Amino acid sequence: MMSVTNNLKVTAGDGASKVSFCNTERFSLIAGPCQMESRDHAFMIAGVLKELCDSLGIGLVYKSSFDKANRTSLSGKRGIGLDSAMEIFADLKKEFGFPVLSDIHTEEQCAIVSEVVDVLQIPAFLSRQTDLLVAAAKTGRVINVKKGQFLAPWDMKNVLAKLNESGNPNVLLCERGASFGYNTLVSDMRSLPIMASLGAPVIFDATHSVQQPGGQGGSTGGQREFVETLARAAVAVGVAGLFIETHEDPDNAPSDGPNMVHLKDMPKLLEKLLAFDAITKA
């Protein structure tokens, strides 16, 4: 049986705020709302997640997007913008002492965002963009690269090589589903050990994996009810981390509402996932 056995460790953050990702150790969590909506909203979500993860002994990397650049509709809300988001991320780190993650879309953003953000995320649609990968790698920050929905898991060896050969060994490979016909994604759990075999900690994105791209005509749909199903399966296989977007009112969130987990449901979900994780890594 092929298993997720490489014990390579990648650590995000500085000093006491460090969070490690390793396929053979307890999973760490990347969580937060899809997009950064306001300072107050970011602090509210962050406070709840920090308290929860501290109580459960889970390492937390707080995530949020300053710009949702690939919205289905031109009128879709995209976020509060780069400058405002960097100020808020800096204040979140001071207040809560956790590393933060945000996605980047252009080479020019890499140097700016890396001054504050600990983990730079490469969106799935941009996972083969060489110039972006090289620019991100050269910042020296941890890179979380989403596997494109159009890529096989073994194709990520080329993505990983671009980052490593640009001088950055601190790479996380993230599974977020594969295209399966129109408006549908499926999660092939074989991809988790396959990507681990390439030499990187593996993250499973449990919320984007249940997206239905463009499934609501002018916006993306999702099947929130299957987040737990897929997360449990991934943890049973064994992963270094889970990526879960969450919101206190997902049905009215400005983006990705149909696939985000309700904030009030996070405690029970994480407790269940920890139980599976303990068995898998015993």
UniProtKB/Swiss-Prot annotation:
Keywords: Cytoplasm, Lipopolysaccharide biosynthesis, Transferase. It comes from the Bacteria. Its main location: cytoplasm. Its EC number is 2.5.1.55. Pathway: Carbohydrate biosynthesis; 3-deoxy-D-manno-octulosonate biosynthesis; 3-deoxy-D-manno-octulosonate from D-ribulose 5-phosphate: step 2/3; Bacterial outer membrane biogenesis; lipopolysaccharide biosynthesis. GO terms for biological process: keto-3-deoxy-D-manno-octulosonic acid biosynthetic process. It holds the Pfam family DAHP_synth_1. GO terms for cellular component: cytoplasm. It is an enzyme of class 2 (transferase). It catalyses: D-arabinose 5-phosphate + phosphoenolpyruvate + H2O = 3-deoxy-alpha-D-manno-2-octulosonate-8-phosphate + phosphate. GO terms for molecular function: 3-deoxy-8-phosphooctulonate synthase activity. It is found in: Cytoplasm. InterPro entries: Aldolase_TIM (IPR013785), DAHP1/KDSA (IPR006218), KDO8P_synthase (IPR006269). HAMAP family: KDO8P_synth. Belongs to the KdsA family. PANTHER family: PHOSPHO-2-DEHYDRO-3-DEOXYHEPTONATE ALDOLASE. This is 2-dehydro-3-deoxyphosphooctonate aldolase.
